[in-house]
């Protein structure tokens, strides 16, 4: 008897397309939505459901790569208006331990910096920022948490030497609220992507291998990986260099002529209205500006409000900014 089975299956995906889906999945580890965009860039139109079936059929569906859709969050209107900054925390073990430093543009999601670090001490972190500033310019604002190295736990005021160095570039610093990681939602979400990428590509076995790995991940994230929040575009398509250039020898602050300007002593203290007040040890010998608000005064260093002081009791506290995400 002759078989009635058709010689070809009209619903079977072209083998070349299936092979390409598998190649892209193995290369990046991304889901069907992103792979669909990559294929379209190559002139291959494949339905999302078909890509998912190929992934499942070839045993490539790994639950850890499935992510929840991004929440709609606050977004700055232009590049370099604000960068979000964070240390990922320990990745790897032993001599391969690494704490990646991430610097992300809020508007475009462009990753201006991704550096392997072993320590949160001043010099290596400052060098990473300086390299970023020399490559991309200076942002208006940096958003960060209350962690070391930008938040100096050794100082009553919380300011660190790194914070002061950053402010000398006339960058306004904004610190997220305590226990509010969602304030830095974009860089926190990137850290989830980073962790998945490292697992997919393989965790380095020595510290020296982190640098090329992070460079590859950064290149893919900025120029290849489609972003849902950007209508499946890439961050590089929306990012522009800052017009503000890095100044290796910044001048002293220039405050408005009507301002009350005081020099902080070598212990971070100053006198105002008969009160001995504290600014920050990290601001020793620097010029600060005082702005009165009824019974309190706000201390500014350059364009960043750093502390709020009671003119009745002399007690001071960190200046609290409204939360943004």
What function would you assign to each model-found segment?
Residues 162-247, 295-297:
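Charged alpha-helix within mobile-element recombinases
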Residues 21, 35, 51, 86, ...:
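Mobile genetic element proteins and their domesticated derivatives, centered on retroelements
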Residues 117-118, 194, 283, 312:
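A generic structural motif
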Residues 45, 49, 55-111, 118-140, ...:
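Mobile-element integrase/transposase regions
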Residues 220-325:
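C-terminal, beta-rich DNA-binding module of retroviral/retroelements integrases
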Residues 1-91, 160-163, 234-243:
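Basic, flexible linker segments flanking DNA-binding modules
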Residues 133-156, 177-179, 184, 231-235:
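Acidic/histidine-rich, metal-coordinating catalytic segments
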Residues 112-113, 307:
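A structural microfeature
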